[in-house]
Curated annotation (Swiss-Prot):
GO biological process: lactate metabolic process; tricarboxylic acid cycle
Gene3D superfamilies: Lactate dehydrogenase/glycoside hydrolase, family 4, C-terminal, NAD(P)-binding Rossmann-like Domain
Function: Catalyzes the reversible oxidation of malate to oxaloacetate.
Gene giving rise to this polypeptide: mdh
Organism: Citrifermentans bemidjiense (strain ATCC BAA-1014 / DSM 16622 / JCM 12645 / Bem)
UniProt-recorded name of the protein: Malate dehydrogenase
Top-level division of the source organism's lineage: Bacteria
Family that this chain belongs to: Belongs to the LDH/MDH superfamily. MDH type 3 family.
Length: 317
């Protein structure tokens, strides 16, 4: 049985972590593309040389030629400028649109059968542009946002309640921006509603609501919080881990239910746009979109988030 092949477009901070994680999990052979000569070659050589230490055996290659991504089963795109303090994800749209156009053309020409996972910001616009230029079916072009946003939400809940993050279940919907929708009603710890636990902890419904609202606000601004602390870039460990989870579900046909930036065709009342929703990811990419009823408050937040996505995508044309 032939090994799977993962292509990484972009040799920056996220690309380096992606390569290391893909190797550690032995998801397949990995090739990293970047336009800077020597950068992907150096990073991949560095990772390859610890195969005997970390216990992995796969072929790792750095390249400046798109031809080397031929035969890739999954392509993960991180190429683009990162945020700097004070910038929103949307501020990157003009420059990163040009980069994404070039990247998508390279993928289309050299890896026409690949599944594509986009990480580049502004995410909702970049995944839309990537699909448009490649012309790939919608189920094969997706964006990573919700896995990370949900993971951040889970982390803050675990810290607040003093429980293992492994036992927290929570999810965000909508766009990857300030209007994302953390679903408070569905957040739980081993099936116990988080709001119930907060009310028990504080013995005050108003206080519990206030604490939850603070966690929701922090989740929405979590990426910016990292940017402000780093000062010279944006998050890279967490986006890479999140994208690898998505890639692994596709490569191993795991059927994981993961919040994914997927193209909607009427689900959640949205048609013709990429928005974060729970999806089943398997060997066919997006195999199902799990639709469920939102209450009035959730629907209003979702509508606001989708409106922001539409405005963002519209500004790209």
């Amino acid at each position: 049985m032939a090994r799977k092949k993962i292509a990484l477009i972009g040799g920056g901070q996220i690309g380096g972590v992606l390569a290391q994680l893909a190797a550690l999990r032995e998801l397949g052979d990995v090739v990293m593309f970047d336009i800077v000569e020597g950068l992907p070659q150096g990073k991949m050589l560095d990772i390859a040389e610890v195969g005997s230490v970390d216990g992995f055996d796969c072929n790792l290659k750095g390249t400046n030629s798109y031809e080397d991504i031929k035969g890739a089963d999954v392509v993960i795109v991180t190429a683009g400028l990162p945020r700097k303090p004070g910038m929103s994800r949307d501020d990157l749209i003009e420059v990163n649109s040009k980069i994404m156009t070039s990247v998508a053309e390279g993928i289309k020409a050299n890896a026409p059968n690949a599944f594509v996972i986009v990480i580049s910001n502004p995410l909702d616009a970049m995944v839309t542009l990537c699909q448009k230029i490649t012309g790939f079916p919608y189920n094969r072009v997706i964006g990573q946002a919700g896995v990370l946003d949900s993971a951040r939400f889970k982390t803050f809940i675990a810290w607040e309640l003093g429980v293992s993050v492994k036992d927290v279940n929570a999810m965000t919907l909508g766009g990857h921006g300030d209007d994302m929708v953390p679903l408070v009603r569905y957040a739980s710890v081993n099936g116990i509603p988080v709001m119930e636990l907060l009310e028990k902890k504080y013995k005050d419904k108003a206080k519990a609501k206030e604490v939850m609202e603070a966690m929701v606000k922090r989740t929405r601004g979590a990426g910016g919080e990292v940017v402000a602390l780093l000062k010279t870039g944006s998050a890279f460990y967490s986006p890479a881990s999140s994208a690898i989870q998505m890639a692994e579900s596709i490569l191993k046909d795991q059927k994981r239910v993961l919040p994914t930036c997927a193209h909607l065709n009427g689900e959640f009342g949205v048609k013709g746009f990429y928005v974060g929703v729970p999806c089943v990811l398997g060997e066919n990419g997006v195999e199902q979109i799990l639709e469920f009823e939102l209450d009035a408050e959730e629907q209003a937040m979702m509508d606001k988030s989708v409106a922001a996505v539409k405005e963002l995508v519209g500004s790209m044309k």
